[in-house]
């Protein structure tokens, strides 16, 4: 009888742990980094944002094509009928700054969580720039986003 109670208790514990793990697991969201854009010099709002249209994109970014033989120097095309753009823009600086997205996850409540790190390194440059990252995510993940700066 004692062995049966031990087995039942162990099974209940295993099932509870498995259900808890399944209920709290976030789904990773794939994304693509947009290339060859720059932050417009009239942008004053540096808060992270989700961009839903070409018009909205053009309020914050310009296109910066570069020469290449294979066409890789063109700005990434964004189809706003299928994708949203996520922009993380930092304040103007003269120190090398990297914005790295550590994860984008869809939570069980339907919201997305975007975690990112900002690191600065090196000596000051004689010029300044506005560090940013611009990534594309599928619209199926929605546009209710929480940004977490790590």
Which sequence ranges carry the predicted segments?
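Bacterial N-terminal signal peptides
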Residues: 10-18
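Bacterial N-terminal signal peptides that target proteins for export
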Residues: 1-9
């Amino acid at each position: 009888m004692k062995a049966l109670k031990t087995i039942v208790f162990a099974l209940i514990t295993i099932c509870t742990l498995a259900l808890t793990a399944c209920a709290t697991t976030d789904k990773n969201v794939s994304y693509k980094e947009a290339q060859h854009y720059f932050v417009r010099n009239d942008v004053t709002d540096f808060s992270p944002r989700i961009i839903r249209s070409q018009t909205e994109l053009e309020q914050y970014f310009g296109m910066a094509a570069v020469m290449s033989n294979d066409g890789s120097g063109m700005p990434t095309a964004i189809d706003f009928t299928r994708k949203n753009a996520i922009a993380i823009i930092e304040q103007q600086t003269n120190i090398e700054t990297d914005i790295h997205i550590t994860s984008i996850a869809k939570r069980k409540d339907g919201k997305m969580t975007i975690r990112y790190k900002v690191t600065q390194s090196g000596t000051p440059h004689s010029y300044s720039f506005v560090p940013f990252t611009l990534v594309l995510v599928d619209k199926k993940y929605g546009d209710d986003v929480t940004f977490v700066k790590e």
